[in-house]
Amino acid sequence: MPRYVVERDFPDGLHVPVNADGAKAMGGVIDTNLTDGVTWVHTYVSTDNNKRNYGVYDATNPEAIRRVGAKNNLPVGKITEVRVLDPYFYR
């Protein structure tokens, strides 16, 4: 399945509580993503009060990512298909 990096901008920052409420919210995002076959792998958050993040997703196509973004009320900016290249590639 193709892998994508998704840029998301949060003008007021992204604030996810580190407690049961945050876990419930993230669980809801995961469940909603599955309705379109999208798997959230992980996300890198910026150091500027979490105003931009870069999520890594497996999905059939960018449109599926946009659909679940809308369902989850999350902004979706640039979507780039990526592949992994690590330093052990040549060994």
Region annotations inferred by a language model:
Residues 1-35, 39-42, 46-50, 62-63, ...:
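Short S/T/G/P-rich N-terminal loop/turn motif that feeds into the first structured element of a domain
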Residues 58-85:
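An amphipathic, aromatic/His-enriched active-site/gating alpha helix that lines ligand/cofactor pockets
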